[in-house]
Amino acid sequence: MKKVFTFCFLFLYYVVSLYADKTINLFVIERSKNANIVKYDAILTNTGKINEKNPIDAYWLLYAKKNGEREELSSFDKKAYGFKTNYNKEKDNFDFVLKAVKDKPMILGLYNNVPKAVIKINNIDCFLEKVYIESKDGALGIPKVSYYELFGKEVSTGKAQQQEILVK
């Protein structure tokens, strides 16, 4: 009886996993304010394609006080760390704008069947790995961004690229 139960459980787990969406890390945002990071994951369907209706999951990883615990972005957080995507059916990818770096549009697509966010770093197409945001406390305690840095690897060569962008 125990073997039958174990088999049924494993079979059910396997079937559910076939139809469940999977997530793969795209990049993170680190900030000078504290150790918490914002993580962006691509959401893949069970066929390995990026989910057209809900392509990205963005959330906090709380390292400052909660040992890396996950927390959803609030409505207020989304004003700074949210994003917009638009599916391009012809190219089978997404135009992607991150509010934190809205002047640097991206493309979200599959490269060798792995989801990647492509952004221009030093005018070179790169796979984005990390954004670092340096900020100071502004009026009413709302942080004011001084600059941000983009970190990635060139799409064509894999060479590391980094660019600091001052915010006016």
Question: Predicted regions span which residues?
Answer:
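Bacterial Sec-dependent N-terminal signal peptides
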Residues: 1-23
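N-terminal export/targeting and maturation segments
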Residues: 18-77, 160-162
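Mature extracytoplasmic domains of secretory-pathway proteins
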Residues: 60-128
